[in-house]
Amino acid sequence: MHQEIIARFNSLKEKQLSIDITRGKPDTNQLDLSNKLLNLSIPLVSENGIDLRNYGEPFGIVEARRLGSELLNAPVENIIAGEQSSLLLTYQTILSNYLFAEPLAWKSLKKPKFICPVPGFDRHFKLLEDFGIEAVPISLIEDGINTQQFEETINDGEEYLGILCVPRHSNPSGTTYSDENIKKMFEIGLNFSNKFLFLFDHAYLI
């Protein structure tokens, strides 16, 4: 088997193919969809009087927050319009808790852990690893996480800080968590601790 794989690999090398297999990179046709946005004429001042060419408000442009509110079916007061990268927002959230979490910064914990459904996003695992946080796997099932396994895992006496997952079109399986699954996740997590952090990477929400 090993020799067969090596032979196939060498055969492909001999063809000197030039293929871009960068993961998650949009096709040119997809990029073209946004071309017209570059030429839009938009107001310079937001509806609450902020000059959009200047530094913005900490929670983001109010019109963008309202759009997020509609997409997420959540109050606009609960929406922050921040970076365009969900991974960066995730990193910043973990960094702030690592340094300043109350009542104890995560950096002061001996064995901090995070729940990570698998299969999952390798960059989530690497991000946690960079902070010395152990990623503890639980299984994905048809409609979301295995809630029984989730409950058993976080109640094993260890220092679980939260869960990091992709509830909508989960990477890489494509699983979408049901409303019932997410509600059960919230119930279990909050019963464990009111400090338990639910980090939903909604990169594929739309």
Where are these regions (language model features)?
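N-terminal "arm"/small-domain region of PLP-dependent enzymes with the aminotransferase-like
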Residues: 1-59, 63-70
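Conserved core of the PLP fold type I
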Residues: 50-194, 205-206
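Hydrophobic "anchor" residues on beta-strands that sit immediately upstream
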Residues: 197-198
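Walker B catalytic acidic pair
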Residues: 201-202
